[in-house]
Amino acid sequence: MVKTKSKKILIVVLSTILSIVMVVVLLLFFPLMGKKHTEVWSAKQEFKLDQLQTVEKNSNQDFKILLLTDTQLWMNPKDNKACYDQIRKLVAQTTPDLIATVGDNVSGVTSRFLLKEWIDVMDSFQIPWAPVFGNHDSEIPMTTLNWQGDQLLKSEYCLFQKGPSNLYGCGNYAVNITEKGEPIYTP
């Protein structure tokens, strides 16, 4: 009787552990694909400024861009907090008109969870921001760049656009800077 009860307990414990492992594997290793961008670029296409994301420059001030690179947020909450604290400090010190993040924003298997947190932090500044992807943003194919792009497109202040599908990568876009409604810089 004791052996049977111990055997049942062991089966329940092992089944529970196996179930937890399966859920974790599904959450971490099932790729989130996202919607593929379908716009196609052609050299014959007419360029239209009004199709670009636009940031208005204050006439009385220089236009300031804060450039952030290689934040590489990952599974260490202490490091992530230090990174966010540093970003907050830089934003407060520089009061930028635009924040650009130039790749390696999130890293590793937890990127699907960290992306939302990162977007929330960036949106909290209420400043337009323009991210691009680096090699670490999709090094582990659990969150494709298309899926990450879908999340960025939901952001209130993010200027990200997926761009044409026939150009390499996801996130080929330009930002138009205007003053009094007139373009002063368009890359």
Predicted regions and their residues:
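N-terminal active-site segment of His-dependent metallophosphoesterases
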Residues: 29-117
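N-terminal Sec-pathway targeting helices
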Residues: 2-21
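Hydrophobic alpha-helical membrane-insertion segments, chiefly the h-region
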Residues: 19-30
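Extended active-site neighborhood of metal-dependent phosphoesterases/phosphodiesterases
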Residues: 37-38, 43-50, 116-187
